């Protein structure tokens, strides 16, 4: 069964998945607030961040959300974590949620500490959980656009919703694995960005592969510990939504979070690094939320804490590294 899909958010990530869904035979209407971007996509049939990609005819665009929703059998969101609440609030004013809503963004809301799925439930109400889905995993947008093999996970509370979303996204090269632990899937995608910043700092100081692999492994331990205390399944974080996504984000040359960390090591301030990258670096905001939650629940997360202190307490990076290296080495999995 082919879907009519409203895709909310036409940044590089949103465009890559909208393009994938259209190439999979679905009718897709992409929405963005920016009329100039919509005009360029509609007239030139090229995305400014990926001008080499031809846009299929069954992918159209609008800056009017009600037009995107017309006849939609599925809604997919691909906006930043900061944009999630205003976009879903606008969506709520236009429709009651009676079709699957697939969240593909990764992050934790500032101030509230809510996962993006929890924002959706707060806005639409608990009964909307039956329509909610979450897609996450190692998926660099530029590689998805090129049709490179990719494996992700999809989670949903309702088995029928899970099947519908799974069918819509699955292609010969975009492998979609079901996972019933929606909160674990969401947390893995959010927290890995903080560890990736630490890996970028390691790259900037040229500490080498041994140090980076240590950060990834110990970082995964922090993520798994955090998620388990939050009620998630530990094995979820050992899979694509945790380890897989963490590896891709930490080692990819296309990772904003890793590049951000590298720029910090080269002497740029956080604001200067964000300006140079020119796009949202989700790990900056997740570091604050994760630190606040970890402090409240007394979860020991030394790498996350160090990144937070560098970003928000002006901790000298060299001092932060020294503090990590001077920690006691206790039993590995404690």
From Swiss-Prot:
Write out the pathway annotation from the protein's UniProt entry: Membrane lipid metabolism; glycerophospholipid metabolism
**Known InterPro entries for this protein?**
6-PGluconate_DH-like_C_sf, 6PGD_dom2, G3P_DH_NAD-dep, G3P_DH_NAD-dep_C, G3P_DH_NAD-dep_N, NAD(P)-bd_dom_sf
Q: Which GO terms describe its cellular component?
A: cytosol
Q: What class of enzyme is it?
A: oxidoreductase
Lineage, top-rank taxon, reads: Bacteria
Q: Identify the stretch annotated as signal peptide in this record.
A: none
Name the record gives this protein: Glycerol-3-phosphate dehydrogenase [NAD(P)+]
Give the organism the record lists: Chlamydia trachomatis serovar D (strain ATCC VR-885 / DSM 19411 / UW-3/Cx)
Q: Which gene carries the instructions for this protein?
A: gpsA
């Amino acid at each position: 069964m082919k879907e009519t899909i409203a895709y909310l958010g036409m940044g590089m990530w949103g465009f890559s998945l909208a393009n994938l869904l259209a190439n999979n035979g679905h009718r897709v209407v992409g929405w963005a607030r920016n009329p100039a971007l919509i005009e360029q996509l509609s007239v030139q049939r090229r995305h400014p961040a990926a001008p080499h990609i031809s846009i299929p005819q069954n992918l159209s665009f609008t800056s009017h959300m009600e037009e995107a929703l017309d006849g939609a059998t599925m809604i997919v969101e691909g906006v930043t974590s900061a944009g999630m609440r205003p976009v879903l609030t606008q969506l709520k004013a236009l429709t009651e949620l009676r079709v699957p809503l697939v969240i593909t963004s990764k992050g934790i809301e500032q101030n509230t500490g809510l996962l993006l799925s929890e924002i959706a439930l707060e806005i639409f109400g608990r009964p909307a959980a039956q329509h909610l889905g979450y897609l996450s995993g190692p998926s660099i947008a530029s590689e998805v656009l090129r049709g490179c093999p990719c494996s992700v996970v999809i989670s949903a509370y309702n088995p029928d919703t899970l099947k519908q979303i799974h069918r819509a996204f699955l292609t010969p090269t975009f492998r979609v694995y079901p996972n019933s632990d929606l909160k674990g899937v969401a947390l893995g995608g959010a927290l890995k960005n903080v560890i990736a910043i630490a890996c970028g700092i390691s790259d900037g100081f040229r500490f080498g592969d041994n140090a980076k692999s240590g950060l990834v492994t110990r970082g995964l331990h922090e993520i798994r510990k955090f998620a388990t205390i939050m009620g998630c399944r530990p094995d979820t974080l050992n899979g694509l939504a945790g380890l897989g996504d963490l590896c891709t984000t930490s080692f990819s040359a296309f990772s904003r979070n890793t590049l951000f960390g590298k720029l910090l090591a080269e002497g740029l301030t956080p604001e200067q690094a964000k300006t140079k990258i020119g796009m949202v670096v989700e790990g900056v905001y997740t570091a604050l939320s994760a630190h606040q939650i970890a402090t409240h629940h007394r979860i020991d997360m030394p790498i996350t804490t160090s990144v937070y202190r560098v970003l928000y307490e002006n901790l000298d990076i060299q001092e932060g590294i020294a503090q990590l290296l001077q920690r006691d080495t206790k039993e590995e999995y404690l």
